[in-house]
């Protein structure tokens, strides 16, 4: 028996846009829903199932393209239910596509993929765009994912009637399984496509541009919708998840959005004060060091850290000075330091004198 044209079922033209198709479906679904029809429930259920199936095909870009090219065989792959209650979860489930929610996605949706991306701290801090290459299954261009040789027919599986699923009754429960005859495809291909050998999918290397937002850190992941494995005909592709790993930096340590670094300074600069250069992710900056600076003193440079991921502004750069003790002194330098040390009194080393005074009182 010939099947009705899906466009005729919904009462729309073949060039109707998505908005027109959805409007027609909503109107017809409301009119013919079995819960709203008082008489002849069986006919209402049949009509409603017909409307629902037509909308499932024409509202999906890939399914509609396959239907336009191959007719009912191309569009029907993995759509609908085989026997049992055609209304699944009831009124709310059926109208899920109109009012939100709805049934679980087809099992033939493409798998999600993961790509581990290592970037340096500067790219993580400031944002960047990087190119990656991933191996993935994509829809065969030769047969548009149908799996059949061009110009040949694809037969509907006689066991599952093209649905790809069969239902069996076990006591009070109905169990649904993939059809063993067609391996869940809903179709029988007599003359396979020479490119994909009837699979509808081909393995390719694809280059993608990934936008890295400023402020990402190790553990963050970026989702690229539809860039996972391609689904079988009529089913959506999976997603690609890019897992970010930030390399350890030679100078900076990161804590949230702040950067820390240790800056060595010489004894004279620490004692007398002066200017020193400190690194940032972009360039070098000069900061003033006051006289009498001690090891461990912190200098905070506002907004010179990592950009915030979800708001404006950046963290800070915190530089900790470390006074470097001179080494490899010659005799003259040693004598000069000795004279300098002898000339210093308690007021020049207040912390040392305070410490030794405490020691004396402690030991009596």
From Swiss-Prot:
GO CC annotations on file: cytoplasm
Q: Where are the CXXCXGXG motif repeats?
A: 140-147, 157-164, 179-186, 193-200
Note describing how the cofactor binds: Binds 2 Zn(2+) ions per monomer.
Query: CDD domains from the entry?
Result: DnaJ (cd06257), DnaJ_C (cd10747), DnaJ_zf (cd10719)
Q: Where does Zn(2+) 1 bind?
A: 140, 143, 193, 196
* Residues the entry annotates as binding Zn(2+) 2: 157, 160, 179, 182
Q: Specify the J domain's residue ranges.
A: 5-71
Q: Which GO terms describe its molecular function?
A: ATP binding; heat shock protein binding; unfolded protein binding; zinc ion binding
Cysteine pairs forming cystine bridges in this chain are none
What InterPro entries does this protein map onto? DnaJ, DnaJ_C, DnaJ_domain, DnaJ_domain_CS, HSP40/DnaJ_pept-bd, HSP_DnaJ_Cys-rich_dom, HSP_DnaJ_Cys-rich_dom_sf, J_dom_sf
Q: Does the keyword Metal-binding apply?
A: yes
Q: Where in the cell is it found?
A: Cytoplasm
Q: Keywords for this entry?
A: Chaperone, Cytoplasm, DNA replication, Metal-binding, Repeat, Stress response, Zinc, Zinc-finger
- Zinc finger, CR-type: residue spans? 127-205
Query: GO biological process annotations for this chain's record?
Result: chaperone cofactor-dependent protein refolding; DNA replication; protein refolding; response to heat
Domain of life the protein comes from:
Bacteria
Q: Which SUPFAM superfamilies match?
A: Chaperone J-domain, DnaJ/Hsp40 cysteine-rich domain, HSP40/DnaJ peptide-binding domain
- Can you tell me where the transmembrane regions are? none
Describe the task this protein carries out.
Participates actively in the response to hyperosmotic and heat shock by preventing the aggregation of stress-denatured proteins and by disaggregating proteins, also in an autonomous, DnaK-independent fashion. Unfolded proteins bind initially to DnaJ; upon interaction with the DnaJ-bound protein, DnaK hydrolyzes its bound ATP, resulting in the formation of a stable complex. GrpE releases ADP from DnaK; ATP binding to DnaK triggers the release of the substrate protein, thus completing the reaction cycle.
**Domain-related comment:** The J domain is necessary and sufficient to stimulate DnaK ATPase activity. Zinc center 1 plays an important role in the autonomous, DnaK-independent chaperone activity of DnaJ. Zinc center 2 is essential for interaction with DnaK and for DnaJ activity.
Annotated family:
Belongs to the DnaJ family.
User: What do we know about how this protein assembles, alone or with others?
Assistant: Homodimer.
Q: Which PANTHER family does the annotation name? A: CHAPERONE PROTEIN DNAJ, DNAJ HOMOLOG 1, MITOCHONDRIAL-RELATED
Q: What is this protein called?
A: Chaperone protein DnaJ
What organism does this protein naturally occur in? Ruthia magnifica subsp. Calyptogena magnifica
